[in-house]
Amino acid sequence: MHEHYQPREIENAAQSFWDEQKSFEVSEQPGKETFYCLSMFPYPSGKLHMGHVRNYTIGDVISRYQRMQGKNVLQPMGWDAFGMPAENAAMKNNVAPAKWTYENIAYMKNQLRSLGLAVDWSREVTTCKPDYYRWEQWLFTRLFEKGVIYKKSGTVNWDPIDQTVLANEQVIDGRGWRSGALIEKREIPMYYFKITAYADELLSSLDDLPGWPEQVKTMQRNWIGKSKGMEVQFPYNVDSIGEAGALKVFTTRPDTLMGATYVAVAAEHPLATQAAQNNPELQAFIAECKGGSVAEADVATQEKKGLPTGLFVEHPLTGEKLPVWVANYVLMHYGDGAVMAVPAHDERDFEFATKYSLPIKSVVRTSSGDTNPAPWQDAYGEHGELINSGEFDGLDFQGAFDAIEVALIKKNLGASRTQFRLRDWGISRQRYWGCPIPIIHCESCGDVPVPEDQLPVVLPEDVVPDGAGSPLARMPEFYECSCPKCGQPAKRETDTMDTFVESSWYYARYASPHYEGGLVEKSAADHWLPVDQYIGGIEHAILHLLYARFFHKLMRDEGLVSSNEPFKNLLTQGMVVAETYYRREANGAYTWFNPADVELERDSKAKVISAKLIADGLPVEIGGTEKMAKSKNNGVDPQSMIDQFGADTCRLFMMFASPPDMSAEWSDSGVEGSHRFLKRVWRLAHAHISQGLPGKLDVAALSDEQKLIRRSIHLAIKQASQDVGQNHKFNTAIAQVMTLMNVLEKAPQATEQDRALVQEGLETVTLLLAPITPHISHDLWNRLGHSDAVIDARWPVQDDSALVQDTLQLVIQVNGKLRGQIDMPATASREDVEAAARVNENVLRFTEGLTIRKVIVVPGKLVNIVAS
């Protein structure tokens, strides 16, 4: 055994052992309790960052701990490999996305292996490989035939230069983020998942997830956005519109119906189109609206604009004529593309009516009174008693809701309705590096799904995109085909799927990644699913986690899985943050410097007072801590840390820096401190082992001093078991081990009994650290005399008898002030404790001349003597 801690040597040996033994390859073992632990798989961007290290270390600690509980633990890993960054890198470097992606995977896989993760690499999946996306295409065809996937025209942001659809986030100030072209609104045919058909279940089954953070469930509830309201119809006739019919609106405030003074429709609404036929001004306004954002958030904050159409509808209860306006704050895809405007009680309507001098009629008595003068107050939107509403006066919200519904039903002009904010999920992308949509377009037969025996539709991998639209649309060798139904020449779909589709079912594929008979092997899926512990960033709270829940229900309804939810427990890990350093250039731009290139000056209390760039010795500004990011150049390369200190040090620091759900602040001194701690463990173990291993501890013959040491050992086991097993507070578990190390370093080693006690202490330290620092634990466990590997050892169990104290130290107070301590037998009665306290010399001194009025004894803690 080396006298000094040699992490590289130790880690190479441990990893070689695990590889040779296939230590983490698992299979179904009926009768043995399973535990499926999964961290969100990475996008192969090129290099691991510290966020990855933290995410995968958390998952690994949980996996290794559960294995020590005797469970059959599955921890797989794969690659979320399709997506835009590969196309961008391909254009920049003139290389095919496939080549770039596979090279990145090879490099990052080596990095992950060097962290010592207990991963079953035999189950690795790569989403850009045909053997993976074949099953995605198979499921697509099944769902298309069932109508769960359908095709319709949708309004999108179209980049006329790049010839592609952009997400709302990719439109900056009305221009394409890459081309700079003015974005057009276009209606293009796209494929949609009917996620709205599952909205109710997606909402209600959140209640079946007690192991999910409340914050994530709230975010999903808000995103799904269930609202109970009423569908109201405003009739019109030949005189007012040119034909008879009714304008449908959805409202969550039917109690305010008597306060409606106009109706507003979206630019795409049929009434707007009709009114614009002979109205050039309205045509121009509609075109302007269609060029605006389709994002709800943008619509909410933009200036409200509108034009009257000259059309009128009737109020359903009063028959009053209400003008129809086209307004830019009404979205065609929400509700029915029309709103009944009640300016007195809705802020957007109020703003619009004030701007265009439309009537404002108060119909609810709110805390601000019976009238609603400008400017808008939040109180105007409150529920309250109805006023100025005829027969409905005096009713509260629910009473008015019910009474107005009855009145509308009588006239056949309305009824209550539940609506969701959630929209169907459009998955068509005019991109190359994605999963091809398995549809063939035939002039005679329409859209025909690719038959199962012709799957997968393979994406050609030798393509270098140029950014102008989809390369597949310019490749006849890809899209020219025959119709599977009639045999006529046909054209293959050239859009690819949204990359969120691949990550919506990967967790299920891990159960049987090499199965060729279907998307999953049912018996394997039932054995492993649902995932017991899922780990990933809170930024995935809505989209990925909602889509994965949706997909699980789709797979259940296809008979592929038996459970209702994919992830039993969810841990959202915090970000890794680090200091930022910058200089402001003459033109106002910021230049950011990496912490490794900066030298800090500290005061006598170690507080940083200034920073300078090592390269030129000139000062730099300190910008505060922010999430590690390329944009701020404050990332730390995990590989350099592993090379310098070893993987165990990196893992220990990451777990010690903060609880997993909080942000962890990177600190060089913290890393060095973690390294020093592992050196201390090694040093103590070396000193102990070099004297030869002791015999068995005789617990019955322990001295009082030895009992205290053994109590520290079992107290550490008790606390760490709670911290790791129940609370995922790895930082406090590590603190327990550090406290135990302080005790063991001071423990005497004079007798065989002393050394046997240190042996028990070192074995405990090794086992408690095994999930966190697996390499050093692997080495020490064998050196401490065990023939089995530490990964096969059981988590230590506390000896409750060791925690029992023969004597207790009690605090003595006089009138609430600390005046001393007394040692008492743990079995002492309240009377014995009080008697001992009364004769304590400090008590006698501080109660001299006073009368003792009361003695309060808190068993095992303190005695308070009240005297006056």
Curated annotation (Swiss-Prot):
Disulfide bonds: none annotated. Its main location: cytoplasm. Pfam families: Anticodon_1 (PF08264), tRNA-synt_1 (PF00133), tRNA-synt_1_2 (PF13603), tRNA-synt_1g (PF09334). Keywords: Aminoacyl-tRNA synthetase, ATP-binding, Cytoplasm, Ligase, Nucleotide-binding, Protein biosynthesis. CDD domains: Anticodon_Ia_Leu_BEm, LeuRS_core. It catalyses: tRNA(Leu) + L-leucine + ATP = L-leucyl-tRNA(Leu) + AMP + diphosphate. The keyword Aminoacyl-tRNA synthetase applies. GO terms for biological process: leucyl-tRNA aminoacylation. A motif ('KMSKS' region) lies at residues 627-631. SUPFAM superfamilies: Anticodon-binding domain of a subclass of class I aminoacyl-tRNA synthetases, Nucleotidylyl transferase, ValRS/IleRS/LeuRS editing domain. A motif ('HIGH' region) lies at residues 42-52. One of its GO terms (molecular function) is ATP binding. Its EC number is 6.1.1.4. It comes from the Bacteria. Gene3D superfamilies: 2.20.28.290, 3.10.20.590, HUPs, Isoleucyl-tRNA Synthetase, Domain 1. ATP binds at K630. It is an enzyme of class 6 (ligase). GO terms for cellular component: cytosol. It is found in: Cytoplasm. PANTHER family: LEUCINE--TRNA LIGASE, MITOCHONDRIAL, LEUCYL-TRNA SYNTHETASE. HAMAP family: Leu_tRNA_synth_B. Belongs to the class-I aminoacyl-tRNA synthetase family. This is Leucine--tRNA ligase.
